[in-house]
Amino acid sequence: DALPISGMPGPYIAIIYNALCDSAQGVAFSPAIGYNVPCINVQRGIAMSCDLLVGSTGFVGGNLLAKHTFAAECHSSDITAQYGTRPDLCVYAGVPAAMFLANADPEADLAVMRAARENIRQIAPKRLVLISSIAVLADSRGVYEDSPAQDTEGLPAYGKNRLQLERWVREDFPDALIVRLPALYGAGIRKNFLFDLHTITPAMLRPEKYSELAAKSPLVKSAYTLADNGFYKLNGTADQAALRAFFAANDFNALAFTDARSRYQFYNLGRLWSDMEAARTADVKLLHLCTPPVSAAEVYAAVTGKTDWHNELPKPPFDYDLRSRHAALLGGSGDYLCTKQQELDDITRFMRSWRD
């Protein structure tokens, strides 16, 4: 129950708050220095469940914060302040999602996974939710939570290292809930096909493509700068609306990087908190949050109303088809959280309400 604290003497607050938040955690209130209890939401003036969000400034973390007020939150630069706090619940959404960087330097990425394991150990939560990825599977087609473990041979470093973190977490916290996410959309989206469909403007260009387009347009010439990785990167100085109009009218734009035949599973982060809570209540240990596979061409048609996009790349298209045993628990049916039409309708609503 909520406890009003306005006007209450400091020593009484200390006694009440330390009792509520389990002073054995080693985190206490001192009237002399103020509130030092992560599990208390002082701004709201009420005692909250002792929960912590790691990764509060990230894409997933930001969407979780929009749905739930955590008693404490942190990110990579201040996470050590949470060591030893032993929250009732820690949602760890602080694993980097930069696939390109992970695959370019696997050892450095594995070191990040080791650091994540140590962070969780030092925080020592009573309950843990680890936000993971569909990328831990070399082939997601027809895979359920209870499917046999796959061979990791050929699995890119990004997926292999995050699978290792899952295994470490299971060793250290046997009752943890591990959540595997597919392609995502929600507030703050900055990548994937939906982002490309909205922006149209490529974030990076190969040198030869930059030279070709810069020769056609002074706007493109000034909009990109050569980066350390050898690509030309969007620098943000050009008129974005004019740049978008240029690429929308050009045969080459951000959509050129996606095969129209590729099938993805798009999950709305707006429902993540409620889905996690339902799974935790049911004591689920591994959760696949999966919607039906939809092709990029189907998404394009649903959003734009056009059927004139048929981009095909030399490499085989992506084909994701993760399944879940817990779909019914979360309001779905069969193996998925919704129908394909419901997924396309929700994506369309999101895309049409998007504001830069």
Q: Which stretches of residues belong to each language-model region?
A:
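Short-chain dehydrogenase/reductase
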Residues: 106, 151-163, 265-266
